[in-house]
Amino acid sequence: SRLMDFMEKFVYPNEQKYYQHINKDKSRWSIPPIMEELKIKAKKENLWNLFLPESKYGAGLSNLEYAPLAEIMGRSFIASEIFNCSAPDTGNMEVLVRYGSDKQKEKWLAPLLEGTIRSAFAMTEPDVASSDATNIQSTIESRKNDYLVNGHKWWTSCAMDPRCKIIIFMGKTDAEAHKYAQQSMVLVPIDTKGVDVVRPLSVFGYDDAPHGHAE
């Protein structure tokens, strides 16, 4: 397949170049230039946004058709990003495609689809089992012209990436509602005043630079 050919010609041969870059202390939290070079090649080959079933934005593949391609990409740590198919961007783009306003799509979805920015999803919290959203303690308060967001998140994947510009943040908007209807999500630009990226956290001893799992 075209994807396998691309992997053989461009992805596997450049893995060492990627690791040589991030294994240097000075460049550890910067993006290896080879990634942007390979993303341009993947775009030209129309091997781009393969995960999105909507043909308007992606390749128009079903989950059944995409699954073996995801398996092939999974053979290399760097592959999914090269084809703009890496988490958490994939899930965040799907949310924006389905539920984003026209303005949100223009500002955030368009550059995500182009692969020029990255994004993060802030759900996990330090004091509760956050995979169950009913435990979330962060709050989102609707005010006249904006929202007041309060919370402490960690293991927010990709928030350390220098290209990360937007966070989808989960919090509670109505503590009096049914426990499965208390939660909402808001878009929070990472440069918003009050957003503090504290430190990278490790998983099994690895910090996953240059993307990271941030507190």
PLM features: residue spans?
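Amphipathic, small/basic residue-rich leader segments at the start of a protein or domain
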Residues: 1-87, 94, 98, 103-111, ...
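Short, solvent-exposed loop/turn elements at beta->coil junctions and helix N-caps
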Residues: 55, 124-129, 155-157, 200-205
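Short glycine/proline-enriched turns and hinge-like loops at secondary-structure junctions
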Residues: 61-63, 131-134, 159-164, 178-182, ...
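A short, Trp-centered hydrophobic/proline-enriched beta-strand micro-motif
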Residues: 115-124, 169
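Flexible, small-/acidic-enriched active-site or ligand-binding loops
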Residues: 135, 191-215
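A structural signal for short hydrophobic beta-strand segments in well-ordered beta-sheet cores
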Residues: 138-141
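A generic structural signal for beta-strand entry/edge sites
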Residues: 144-148, 211-213
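A short core secondary-structure module
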Residues: 146, 150-198
